[in-house]
Swiss-Prot record:
Enzyme Commission number, as recorded: 2.8.4.4
InterPro entries linked to this entry: Elp3/MiaA/NifB-like_rSAM (IPR006638), Methylthiotransferase (IPR005839), Methylthiotransferase_CS (IPR020612), Methylthiotransferase_N (IPR013848), Methylthiotransferase_N_sf (IPR038135), NA-bd_OB-fold (IPR012340), Ribosomal_uS12_MeSTrfase_RimO (IPR005840), rSAM (IPR007197)
The UniProt record lists the keyword Ribonucleoprotein: no
First-tier enzyme category under EC: transferase
NCBIfam families per the UniProt record, alphabetical: 30S ribosomal protein S12 methylthiotransferase RimO, MiaB/RimO family radical SAM methylthiotransferase
Name listed for the protein in its UniProt record: Ribosomal protein uS12 methylthiotransferase RimO
Family the entry assigns: Belongs to the methylthiotransferase family. RimO subfamily.
Annotated source species: Klebsiella pneumoniae (strain 342)
Lineage: Bacteria, Pseudomonadati, Pseudomonadota, Gammaproteobacteria, Enterobacterales
Length: 441
């Protein structure tokens, strides 16, 4: 006779950035391990967990709407994530929410689930849960979160008030997770955090251990160890500290992907100072030139904010001049919008919305031209492509220069002999502003 009784069903909604996605995966893995069933619909779930985002106003609105929908469809809702740090704001709109916790409060979330839907009696066959845990990404790539929180106090950002100061995960724990993922068939690891290059600062870069060997808790040491897995390793959210220079040779040697996601935010020294960001465009340009000399295939991704309080036409022109000089490969641009709790809200000379829109359009027009020219240089070359999707019309994948969700794609029209997770060599035949088209070699 089975000792499994009712298997409680949990609905789950995950919003926001990849860092939130990793938190969701951790909660789901624990729930599955304890015998809960995770279901894709609200109506037959015993309760619903909503992992929220609260970074910008549109994300707050999306989170509140998701909570409202879960309440309407199910009625029993637990809220966690970044917006959970603002309990009063949630309760004001949705007073019937069962419980609210802040970000990375895994244990609290599980305690609340146990309270409202007690743990089922079951044989904990952990083999029922994949060794790498429950993943919300395709099987061939995964996010590897190395730390939580941030020590910076950028005036446009409220992340430290939600997620706290930097807390680095033990390097042995990070490397063990990476090994499990690689052993499970993951072909690409995307290293993420609020501030990847600060990894280990909070623990004074102390020595940890992996497989009985000492390893320093630092971004560079982490990259050297991850390189031994023989899979793609991609760095995201890299703050432009001086020691970032030390990972470029690893990229040139093919140990990790020649890809750097380094949010620069602006180029005007005055605006960077108002943002509380490091402030020398000339120094950044010199570093970029040096990086490309060491690693010619380096792909640089960055993000910028236009219309920040106090930004003049002269400041904006400095940003455009920087783009022309830097010729970055992948660029995201945001129109500044006030975020509740951000100190930038108190700055003088807020920029009118129509001016933000006009500057954003000029920025994007210039960067699209640069991006198209950069991609055109790849036509005729052979590149490696990681296949993401295959259907009857062909395959879609990404090159080493393309992170999932945020960058471009490589289209292999008519190529149906491959499967997701395959790495194939492709000759590039056509390019536009964002994407490439090619044929398998």
């Amino acid at each position: 006779m089975s000792n499994v009784t009712h298997q409680p069903k949990i609905g789950f909604v995950s919003l926001g950035c990849p860092k939130n996605l990793v938190d969701s995966e951790r909660i789901l893995t624990e729930l599955r391990t304890e015998g809960y069933d995770v279901v894709p619909t609200y109506d037959n779930a015993d309760m619903v967990i909503v992992n929220t985002c609260g970074f910008i106003d549109s994300a707050v609105q999306e989170s509140l709407e998701a909570i409202g929908e879960a309440l309407k469809e199910n009625g029993k809702v637990i809220v966690t994530g970044c917006l959970g740090a603002k309990e009063d704001q949630i309760r004001e709109v949705h007073p019937k929410v069962l419980e609210i916790t802040g970000p990375h409060s895994y244990e609290q979330v599980l305690e609340h689930v146990h309270h409202y839907s007690p743990k089922p009696k079951h044989n904990p066959f952990l083999s029922l849960v994949p060794e790498q845990g429950v993943k919300l990404t395709p099987r061939h790539y995964a996010y590897l979160k190395i730390s939580e929180g941030c020590n910076h106090r950028c005036t446009f950002c409220i992340i430290p008030s939600m997620r706290g100061d930097l807390v680095s995960r033990p390097i042995g724990e990070v490397l063990a997770e990476a090994k499990r993922l690689a052993d499970a068939g993951v072909k690409e690891l995307l290293v993420i955090s609020q501030d990847t290059s600060a990894y280990g600062v909070d623990v004074k870069h102390r020595t940890g251990f992996h497989n009985g060997m000492p390893v320093k808790t630092s971004m560079v040491s982490l990259c050297e160890e991850l390189a031994k897995l023989g899979i793609w390793v991609r760095l995201h959210y890299v703050y432009p500290y001086p020691h970032v220079d030390d990972v470029i040779p690893l990229m040139a040697e093919g140990k990790i992907l020649p890809y750097l996601d380094i949010p620069l935010q602006h180029a005007s020294p005055r605006i960077l100072k108002l943002m509380k960001r490091p402030g020398s465009a000339d120094r950044q340009l010199a570093r970029i030139k040096q990086w490309r000399e060491i690693c010619p295939d380096l792909t640089l991704r960055s993000t910028f904010i236009v219309g920040f309080p106090g930004e003049t036409e002269e400041d904006f022109q400095m940003l455009l001049d920087f783009l022309k000089e830097a010729r970055l490969d992948r660029v995201g641009c945001f129109k500044y919008s006030p975020v509740e709790g951000a100190t930038a809200n108190e700055l003088a000379d807020q920029v009118p919305e129509e001016v933000k829109e006009e500057r954003w359009n000029r920025f994007m027009q210039l960067q699209q031209q640069i991006s198209a020219e950069r991609l055109q240089e790849k036509v005729g070359r052979e590149i490696l492509v990681l296949v993401d999707e295959v259907d009857e019309e062909g395959a879609i994948g990404r090159s080493m220069a393309d992170a999932p969700e945020i960058d471009g794609a490589v289209y292999l029209n008519g190529e149906t002999r491959v499967k997701p997770g395959d790495v194939v060599r492709v000759k590039v035949e056509h390019a536009d502003e964002y994407d490439l088209w090619g044929t398998r070699v």
